[in-house]
Amino acid sequence: SSCNSKKYLEDDQSFLMSNKIKIKSSYPIHNKSEIKESFLNYYRQPQTKYALFFPRHVFYYQYQEKLKAKPDHKKWDEERIIKNRPVIYDSLKAEQTSDDFEKYLQLRGYRSATVNYEAKTEKKVTKVLYQVNPGPRIFLDTILIIAEDSMLQEIVDKTKDNILIPPESA
């Protein structure tokens, strides 16, 4: 059928149909929904988008077939083709996404964060589950700067009120 876009895939290919995130930790996570929302910016491969209950790539392949049949057919502008281009699952990009999620968390105080992913492929459709364990969050309570040079310590003591880290961000 014209809707079966799987026929265009190679034997080792599948469509990426979903990216899910599961955040679980034995430590309190105060901003779970904010973390999930921020992760949306770090996907190396976004999941397939839908239009009228059909994956967008169905329209992409239908358009490609029309072009083969009628080469002089008016071409879509490049932007529309890109929007409907199929998302083929790439395990390297899933691994990079996991690494990016970990780095994001580590920069926000979750120094022992771990992120693993599991990809399940069935009938040329892949679903990826990212399992996120932020671990404990580290907060700075006190920053103490001690200089062995008394002149340097005097400069540090004079400038300690001009700190760049506001107390409420700790």
Question: Model segments located where?
Answer:
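Interaction-mediating elements
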Residues: 4-170
